[in-house]
């Protein structure tokens, strides 16, 4: 359940107010004045908490919960204990998130780790840097020459913003993050310990390894979120680009000249080699590695721990080592298991990776 030590929720809500906010139907309208003061998982919830149920795997938690109210689909509302108020809704998780965002705005984005409202005395800011009103700079942060930072942005403790970097409005740069050779849009969240804009890993071998100059930039568009420990190399001759609305998890490596489209999701510990391209709405599971110079088409999905050496067409699902269409990969796994058990049978036919029409 949520901790009031770190997160300060809004005042309590009635079930009628929650129903209106989440567009749910309160099955027993007579309970409309019943008060809820927080959110919790069903197994930890008490009489003042709101929970939600959507996955049949956790039906035992639903049947044993002590929650005061539960968001649930009509299909499962008969499994809700009598003491729990039922809020009927088409998508319980979406309704729950809507209410959570409403009462916990303080958890939506990092703020100053020191409760600061201005520039800390120990911060170092070059005289030529331009900070709009409302920028917060925590202790020991360093802001270099000709840096521009928009209103409402927060620069965490020990962060280093190098010469010429531009950061838009309502951004957050986490503690001990370094940013150089970068242009960053509005409402970008960069969590602690990230390194953005260092030179890419490019050498040629002529008796010794000779470094290739990296003279591009990093372009991060609006509404991007980058998790802790992620590194984004600047481009060599062209820019490294992260598209609008993309969300990147912790400890991801983005190589030089990479182009990531809009609204992609990249899970932890992925490695994106130089000069590859992700289209829009691409999803990568954890620990995916992608070869350089390949193209992952719009809407493609790659399963966790896959190694991708070839381009993936738009809309397809690939996985494995080396990655291939997932249904082909699964059939090959089954065939190998049968061989290990001494079974017989023809090898499965190849698959194009496209979902079959079930209509």
From Swiss-Prot:
It catalyses: a UDP-3-O-[(3R)-3-hydroxyacyl]-alpha-D-glucosamine + a (3R)-hydroxyacyl-[ACP] = a UDP-2-N,3-O-bis[(3R)-3-hydroxyacyl]-alpha-D-glucosamine + holo-[ACP] + H(+). PROSITE patterns: HEXAPEP_TRANSFERASES. One of its GO terms (biological process) is lipid A biosynthetic process. Its EC number is 2.3.1.191. HAMAP family: LpxD. Belongs to the transferase hexapeptide repeat family. LpxD subfamily. This is UDP-3-O-acylglucosamine N-acyltransferase. It comes from Rhodopseudomonas palustris (strain HaA2). The lineage of its organism: Bacteria, Pseudomonadati, Pseudomonadota, Alphaproteobacteria, Hyphomicrobiales.
């Amino acid at each position: 359940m949520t901790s009031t030590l770190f997160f300060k929720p809004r005042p309590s809500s009635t079930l009628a107010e929650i129903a209106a906010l989440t567009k749910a139907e309160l099955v027993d309208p007579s309970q409309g004045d019943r008060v809820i003061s927080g959110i919790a998982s069903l197994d930890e919830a008490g009489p003042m908490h709101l929970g939600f149920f959507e996955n049949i795997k956790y039906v035992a938690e639903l049947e044993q919960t002590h929650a005061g109210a539960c968001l649930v689909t009509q299909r499962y509302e008969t499994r809700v204990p009598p003491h729990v108020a039922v809020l009927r809704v088409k998508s319980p998780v979406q309704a729950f998130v809507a209410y959570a965002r409403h009462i916990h705005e303080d958890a939506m984005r990092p703020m100053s780790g020191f409760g600061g409202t201005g520039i800390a005395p120990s911060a170092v800011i070059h005289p030529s840097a331009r900070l709009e009103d409302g920028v917060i700079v925590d202790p020991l942060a360093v802001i270099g020459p000709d840096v521009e930072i928009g209103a409402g942005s927060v620069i965490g403790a020990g962060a280093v913003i190098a010469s010429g970097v531009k950061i838009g409005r309502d951004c957050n740069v986490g503690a001990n993050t370094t940013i150089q050779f970068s242009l960053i849009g509005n409402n970008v969240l960069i969590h602690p310990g990230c390194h953005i804009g260092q030179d890419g890993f490019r050498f040629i071998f002529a008796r010794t390894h000779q470094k290739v100059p990296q003279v591009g930039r990093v372009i991060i568009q609006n509404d991007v979120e980058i998790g802790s420990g992620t590194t984004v190399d600047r481009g060599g001759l062209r820019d490294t680009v992260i598209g609008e609305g993309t969300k990147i998890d912790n400890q991801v490596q983005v190589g030089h000249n990479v182009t990531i489209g809009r609204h992609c999701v990249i899970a932890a510990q992925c490695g994106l080699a130089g000069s590859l391209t992700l289209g829009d709405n691409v999803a990568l599971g954890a620990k995916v590695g992608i070869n350089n110079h390949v193209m992952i088409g719009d809407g493609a999905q790659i399963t966790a721990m896959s190694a991708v050496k070839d381009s993936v067409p738009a809309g397809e699902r690939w996985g494995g080592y080396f990655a291939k269409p997932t249904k082909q990969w699964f059939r090959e796994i089954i065939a190998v298991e049968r061989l290990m058990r001494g079974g017989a049978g023809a090898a499965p036919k190849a698959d194009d990776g496209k979902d079959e029409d079930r209509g």
